């Protein structure tokens, strides 16, 4: 494509390839570079908040609500609002962030927003104010993840993306259990040990999580270098003025690239289902009356299961291809949704659900991130990942809204969960119709 008002790409494709962190022939393909490790570490930091959001925060929010409050619908609408804000902001900011030096600035701003709001949740708030602060923290998290995902193309090569992305999710799952276990021990043992109330211990867990998040973000902040970019700092103003025209050009380029467009549509639907299952599993279990302790421990098991399974998924992608493994995960998620809707009634079934989700959750997320990175232009990575995020977050709006609305209208949370299967079925059709552009080539996509 031809970008309107686009500054000259810096560096050139040849220079970018020379600067990209390639692996030397002497280095084992099984070893990771320091930059790859420091990129992975951020997943360890932010995943602590993700896990707390899945297991503890919905339960705490439910305790703040009136007795007749419906946490499933309230939580669904909260997730919808957070996703909508990110979906609107990311394509615009993503285009600007492709300017040299801007990506790390936007990343830092959203990261700090997430951390500060995570600490703010520790304040004595009513249920509505608490959910508003949580929405702001979620916006900070998801905004930082958009720029973090796009950093993958600056961190490793096409051939290693599946592996590095999978390791990011894997170590995020296992690493996040450390502060989570500390927080759970504090919540359940703090009242007897320190004489604090359970509420005070829960609030303290928010601060612990924020500190962990900060500690594991510092390595990335101090080491990241933007290899692929479209303008030097002196050309930033011109690039920003052309942002809206560039967004239109990028969208037209995505539409023109049929394999990429087909994948984006499939991604829109299946990541919607995945994110909805993740964000609403605990609130669904709570609504069914499952004990909070059982919910928390079961979700902790998910993290431990997801660690090896994410790494295994990355290895299988090297053998069978990323798209094949993504398709397999979509089929698996359809089975998971049917299980949750028809069979999940007690703690035992929730444990089974947690294990099943752990087997496929990290794999489908990691391979989606790396597969997309292989088929887009590297010098426009943040702009393209902005659209990746708008597809993902807009999808999340639909998924959580669908579950929340269906549950509210029918009064049956199981029917709301079952609606997720429709999204997965549509995604499966588009995946099966898509021609895999990575087959027989390891070259990155280029801008027409």
For the regions a language model picked out, list residue spans one by one.
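Juxtamembrane intracellular "pre-TM" segments in multi-pass secondary transporters
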Residues: 23-36, 224-264
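Helix-loop boundary and gating motifs at the non-cytosolic
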Residues: 27-83, 259-298
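Helix-to-loop junctions at the C-terminal end of transmembrane segments
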Residues: 88-102, 308-322, 407
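Structural signature of the two symmetry-related core transmembrane helices
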Residues: 105-120, 324-339
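Hydrophobic core of transmembrane alpha-helices in multi-pass small-molecule transporters
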Residues: 117, 128-144, 349-363
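Intracellular juxtamembrane helix-capping segments at the cytosolic ends
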Residues: 143-157, 363-377
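A membrane-interface helix-boundary motif in multi-pass transporters
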Residues: 187-211, 405-424
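Multi-pass alpha-helical transporter architecture, strongest
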Residues: 212-223, 418-448
